[in-house]
Amino acid sequence: MAVQNTLPDPNNKINAAGEIDSNGSAGPGFSSVSLTSQQPITVNRSNSGLAFRSISKFQKFSVDIKYNKLTKAEFNVVYPYLMERQASLEAFFVELPQYGNTSAGSKEITADASAGTNQLTLANTTNINVADLFSVTVPSDDTHVKVYKVTKINNNVITVSPQIQRPIDVSNSGTETANFSTPKMRVIVSGPDIQYSVDVTGLYSFSVKLEETLS
């Protein structure tokens, strides 16, 4: 069986060996997910007061996940998974159903897109909405793990933010797709602490902060 590289949740089960297993333990669902876009900028001002702005670093998303009160069994599915990846600095994926659009599903990308462009041409844009979050699947490039937001829709062309991180060549073997139904973000644990508490009834209170990473 393959190693489970997605944070365990009701759709991504894990067994005691850390593998994907449909008969394994389901992770708890999220009570809330906060998504933040971080785009550092530099602002310089002239003596006359004019402001000159420039992007100083790459854009990334951060994710703040909160859980409802957890039983010990539920807690012990997700917490060891996160601890192991915090200690090893290993990246993993988190599935974000709250930001998915199951009606849109997956759409084939039908035209090449160069790195730095902000547009993608799809087979159709049926049921896609402005502000939808999506990831892409490029069979010839498994390092394209960035997620994007739709900012405009014009016929079969969507405008996205941030700009496309890696080139997409549709002439290569396989089908390049934009995945709207259950976008997955590649992340690492943010910061040095993963804190939890246990109340008098034995229920666990727990949340975790993650940040997007491309490596």
Write out the residue ranges for each language-model feature.
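Extracellular/virion structural assembly segments
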Residues: M1-S215
